Amino acid sequence: RDLRMSRGLGDVYKRQMLLYDNTKQEAYMKPHIHTITELAIFTAIAFIFSYIESLFPLPIPFPGIKLGLANLVIVLVLYKNGFCQALTVSIVRGLLNAFTFGSLFGFLYSLAGSVLSLIIMNLLKNKTHLHISAFGVSVAGGITHNIGQFAVAAWLVGPSGILPYFPFLYFSGLIAGGLIGAFVLLCRQRIPLFSSTN
């Protein structure tokens, strides 16, 4: 009888531990699933913006200059989810672009610009004592994004052939970053999902 009782208590203990482990695992997985789902949605939106922008190129006689609507999503993710998540969205979006309507070289340009601009934007965003707004961060990101792309082009074809092109890239990054920054401020003021972020 004592042996049966001991086995019964052991079974109850095992069931309780199994239930505890399952509950603990669910509590651990829920925020991760939410984050993955959220980033997937942001990536899809950024990809759609890139695709729409590819259908309506700007009437400018300089190749590669565009507004970069997808960067609106990237900057918002940077403020809401942080650097790593913004970088993830940017890289996955770049890969989707390359596999659908882009090219390998286009992905290299995009990757260089995205990584450099995100590093700079993250540094400026975290320098809270400088009081740099999301608008200023976005402007810096627009400029450094084009600088990163220029660096890749200079490495591939040589700097002498594209050096005269640099001022146009600089000012286009300045203008695009300003426009994106204005939209970022508007989204953070009007959309509750982003309004509580730093």
Name each model feature, range by range.
Residues 39-41, 48, 89, 110-144:
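Short helix-perturbing small/polar motifs within transmembrane alpha-helices
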Residues 46-50, 93, 97, 117, ...:
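Alpha-helical transmembrane segments of multipass membrane proteins
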Residues 1-13:
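Short, small-residue-biased leader/transition segments that mark boundaries at the very start
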Residues 31-42, 67, 71, 86, ...:
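Residue-level signature of transmembrane alpha-helical entry/exit and packing/kink sites
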Residues 29-77:
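Hydrophobic transmembrane alpha-helices
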Residues 69-83, 120-125:
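Generic transmembrane alpha-helix motif of multi-pass integral membrane proteins
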Residues 103, 107-108, 127-198:
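Membrane-embedded alpha-helical hairpins and interfacial helices in multi-pass inner-membrane proteins
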Residues 50-67, 92-121, 157-161, 165-166:
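Interfacial aromatic-anchored transmembrane helix boundaries in multi-pass membrane proteins
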